[in-house]
């Protein structure tokens, strides 16, 4: 995905779980073969040398405020809105990497953007439900507030981040998906890395099942 960052935008890991009744699996085998999201997060750090496990990873549902912002910024009469991942906080985790198409250098987004505070700011913006020009200005101010230029990749400025944010969230134009790809526009491409949590008897959570966003027959 890194070598082909101009064509790849998402990598999703599927952890190992033991379906059904697992009373016949001894503790030694379970400990050896179970691979959880925690293992994945630390392996990305240990094997790729990027991301900080406690800083750069967040629940997939944490992207909800940005879906709401996209819906606010596009035409209210649009046939389709943004995809909103309203799953349980324990459903999965994700992180955002910026990959340079030429050098293949990787930088976590949260290295130079306070995403937690930015999400809170975006929630205030969407709750205000003001006209698009005002919401756009508020979003720009929120990015200015949370951008850390001294930690950003060389040559990557606030204006580029703002343009790329609108593009990646589908918020430019009058409808989601109006612009199919921005692969040729930016030197740094967004690579979203995520992992799903498949439950087993060892960690089953009924509330998480109730909030699952993947339909099962």
Where on the chain are the PLM-derived regions?
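Radical SAM enzyme core and accessory elements
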Residues: 75-217
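Charged, glycine/proline-rich intrinsically disordered loops and linkers
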Residues: 63-78
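Conserved C-terminal portion of the radical SAM core fold
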Residues: 1-67, 88-92
């Amino acid at each position: 995905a890194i070598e082909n960052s101009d064509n790849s935008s998402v990598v999703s890991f599927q952890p190992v779980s033991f379906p059904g009744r697992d009373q016949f699996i001894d503790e030694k085998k379970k400990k050896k073969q179970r691979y959880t999201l925690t293992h994945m997060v630390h392996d990305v750090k240990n094997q790729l040398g990027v991301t900080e496990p406690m800083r750069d990873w967040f629940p997939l549902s944490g992207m909800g405020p940005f879906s709401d912002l996209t819906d606010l910024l596009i035409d209210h009469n649009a046939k389709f809105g943004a995809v909103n991942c309203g799953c349980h906080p324990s459903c999965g985790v994700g992180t955002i990497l910026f990959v340079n198409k030429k050098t293949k250098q990787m930088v976590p987004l949260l290295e130079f953007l306070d995403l937690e505070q930015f999400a809170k700011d975006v929630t205030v913006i969407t709750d205000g439900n003001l006209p698009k020009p005002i919401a756009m200005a508020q979003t720009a101010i929120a990015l200015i507030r949370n951008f850390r230029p001294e930690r950003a990749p060389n040559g990557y400025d606030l204006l580029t981040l703002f343009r790329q944010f609108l593009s990646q969230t589908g918020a430019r134009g009058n409808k989601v998906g109006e612009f199919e790809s921005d692969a040729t526009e930016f030197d740094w491409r967004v690579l979203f890395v995520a992992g799903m949590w498949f439950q087993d008897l060892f960690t089953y959570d009924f509330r998480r099942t109730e909030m699952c966003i993947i339909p099962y027959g």
